[in-house]
Design a protein with these regions (language model features):
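Canonical Radical SAM [4Fe-4S] cluster-binding loop centered on the CxxxCxxC motif
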Residues: 2-37
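Cysteine-centered iron-sulfur cluster-binding motifs in ferredoxin-type domains/subunits
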Residues: 11-18, 61-64, 299-301, 305-307
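Short cysteine/histidine-rich metal-coordination sites, predominantly Zn2+-binding motifs
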Residues: 34-42, 315-317
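Short, positively charged
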Residues: 38, 219-229, 276-283
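Radical SAM/AdoMet-radical enzyme domain recognition
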Residues: 39-58, 65-182, 188-191
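Radical SAM enzyme [4Fe-4S]-AdoMet core and its adjacent flexible, acidic
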Residues: 126-251, 259-269
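Flexible mid-to-C-terminal extensions adjoining Fe-S/redox cofactors in radical SAM and related proteins
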Residues: 261-317
Length: 317
């Protein structure tokens, strides 16, 4: 059996917001949820091929599904993985606006991590609704949670302010740029590369020398680990995520990433294969693997290559 895999599951592409940087255009945000039969089949394949797995419930907005859905999910996980918490874990990535005390209590009971997409004081730049009240409740109730902030053209030079905002709250934070896909292909949300780099360097310098900081700022924290000798350098928490990471859409189709993947990278469908190894033998996977190899060969002579590993296959541009 292989050691582990991370599986992003998009149980729905529907969302209660219309964020200007979303990977999915309004036409893609259709009603239609993943079936429990598809999940049952997926969990069976994962449990047969991997020692452990981490499931990330994404979207769309996963909280548009009722809590009864997630109770059924937990029952299916127990069916295939048993009660061994070392074999399986879960994170729900949400915009936070639909979180309530009842679901937070359920997450605590089942040790489900909560990831909230939130830009703090700059939230209105990209989003319509603000989850601050829900985030405060997560903190008060001792839920395991973290925040992901997306850096736009407007906030590229304000990353340091974002870091300070979340540092003062003691909130684990990850920063990532808007990528030119989906809704972000239109408008002016994608940050200027020079501004983004400048803002990132300023934030890294402050975080590195901040004696009061108790949060592992991502991706900067990973760069430090790489510098200190991590054997598998990357700007992704999953190192070279290819073969260790997949995304499953509501219809069961498999892609190598949760970000905006073109159809050419489609790796098959959960309902049409008997093992995940088939997905990793697909033409779609071979295409993204070839592109990754070509990019790394191009980047290999760069002095910082050993720390970033050529970047992410989906947003290195």
């Amino acid at each position: 059996m292989k050691p582990y895999i991370s599986v992003v599951i998009k149980p729905t592409l529907y969302c209660n917001e219309s964020c200007s940087h979303c990977y999915h255009t309004p036409g893609e945000r259709i009603l239609g949820n993943i079936s429990l039969e598809t999940l049952d089949r997926l969990f069976e394949m994962v449990s047969n091929e991997y020692q452990s797995a981490w499931f990330i419930w994404h979207g769309g907005e996963p909280m548009t599904l009722p809590m009864s859905f997630y109770k059924s999910v937990m029952e299916l996980e127990e069916k295939h993985f048993g009660k061994n918490t070392f074999r399986v874990g879960n994170t729900i990535q949400t915009n936070g606006t639909l979180l309530n005390r009842r679901f937070m209590a359920y997450c605590r009971e089942k040790a489900i991590n909560v990831g909230v997409s939130w830009e703090g004081p700059y939230n209105s730049v990209l989003r319509e609704l603000d989850p601050e009240k829900a985030v405060s409740m997560l903190s008060d109730k001792d839920n395991r949670y973290s925040v992901s902030s997306t850096i736009s053209a407007e906030t590229a030079l304000k990353q340091k302010e974002l870091y300070r905002f979340f540092r003062d709250r003691g909130t684990n934070l990850s920063l990532s740029p808007v990528i030119p896909a989906g809704c972000a292909r239109c408008g002016n949300t994608v940050p200027d590369p020079d501004d983004y780099i400048r803002g990132s360097i300023e934030t890294f310098d402050e975080w590195l020398h901040d004696a009061d900081s108790k949060i592992p700022l991502v991706p900067h924290y990973l760069y430090v680990l790489n510098y200190l000798g991590d054997p598998t350098p990357s700007d992704c928490a999953h190192t070279s995520c290819l073969t260790k990471w997949i995304c499953v859409n509501p219809d069961g189709s498999i892609y190598p990433c949760a970000k905006a993947c073109p159809e050419e990278f489609r790796m098959g469908n959960v309902n049409e294969i008997s093992a995940l190894s088939e997905a990793f033998s697909s033409e779609g996977f071979r295409r993204i693997l070839a592109g990754s190899v070509a990019r790394r060969e191009k980047c290999a002579s760069c002095e910082v290559y050993r720390y970033c590993n050529g970047g992410c296959s989906m947003d290195a541009y």
